[in-house]
Amino acid sequence: MAGSSFGKSFRVTTFGESHGAALGAIVDGVPAGIPLSEEDIQKYLDRRRPGTSSVTTSRNESDKCRIYSGVFGGLTTGTPVMVMIENTSQRSQDYDELAITYRPGHADFGYDSKYGFRDYRGGGRSSGRETIGRVIAGAIASKALDMLGIKVQAFTQSIGNVYAQSLNLDECGENAVYMPDKDAAMRAIELIKEAKSDKDSLGGIIGCIATGVMPGLGEPVFDKLDARLSAAIMSIGAVKGVEFGAGFHVSTMTGSQNNDPFYIDEDDEGLHIRKRTNMSGGILGGISDGSPIIINAAIKPTPSIAKEQDTVNAINEEVKLEIKGRHDPVVVPRAVVVVESMVAITLFDMVLENMKSRMDNVLKVYKDKI
């Protein structure tokens, strides 16, 4: 199966299936000298771990990670970093009836059409547990970005028709849905419980803000920063749309409303070019402009629902289906760290790519050694 690797200079390969023995990631291109421990990675994994609240799946996996290579004495060595976790709470018997039945909204039919064979236990490679490898790599990328003063933070913008009305990012970790608005979070939790009681599910929007990003990241024409970020986020199974800055609202604006006016700002470090607004979401012409990068990702409702649905099977019979097993009534809260990770992976990859864009970057590294 091709398509399990992402990135150029910071190359991430994920492996494993939902009901297989283990999952993880191999990350190549990690510079030597980044402080990294299993605890650093575990903090990220715990944010997507199942079984942590009433609004997530009851599948209770510890998701404890182990670093197998690429780290010595608490620092990355410059060799590929391999991190793996073991699956411990599979209940594969819950999926026996799905061996030949196609679940609506899932990848079953597509996988059968492409490969003529599929791992039907929890979706196999198309399961949300595949994102464990992304979060591992995202934790590593975030450690590197921290050293550059770049911070990436994702959060729940909405669940169903409940939207956050404020952006108090410190409140995200204080509620089960990672919303930056505690009042909206309470309403969202009640809405999730209603959907769960109805044997149904919900979707939502995940927002992400990256601050401290230097101007100049992005490679014209086909590797624009927003193009690479879009590809990264759209590769997450539950994501159905991505927008930057004002997003689709720009279609209703005039040019004078959409254009971000520039001005000169002066501080102790000198003169800086700034923007008065940020309709562009921090990216102009596919290149970062130094403003915060603002992203929204649309997340579809969880397709695994207990409500009866019409479907077909592999022997061309129309059948009724009520999905058993342990599933999230909404994946948005657990997908927050996945979106955050894909943004961090992409930004650090582009930082490394950008090192070769100018000769003075090369001279800063090598001039004293010549």
Which residues does each PLM region occupy?
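N-terminal, positively charged regions that mediate nucleic acid binding
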Residues: 1-59
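A structural-propensity feature for long, helix-poor, extended segments
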Residues: 51-70, 76, 163-166, 171-183, ...
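Internal helix-turn-beta structural module
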Residues: 11, 83, 304-370
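Short acidic, glycine/tyrosine-flanked loop/strand segments centered on an H-E-D-like triad
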Residues: 99-124, 309-329
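Glycine-rich, mobile lid/loop segments that gate access to catalytic sites or pores
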Residues: 113-221
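Glycine-rich anion/phosphate-binding loop at the beta-strand->alpha-helix junction
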Residues: 18-21, 199-202, 206-318
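Glycine-rich, N-terminal phosphate-binding loop and its surrounding beta-alpha-beta segment
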Residues: 45-104, 108
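Alpha-helical support elements that line or immediately flank enzyme active sites
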Residues: 21-33, 128-150, 223, 227-231, ...
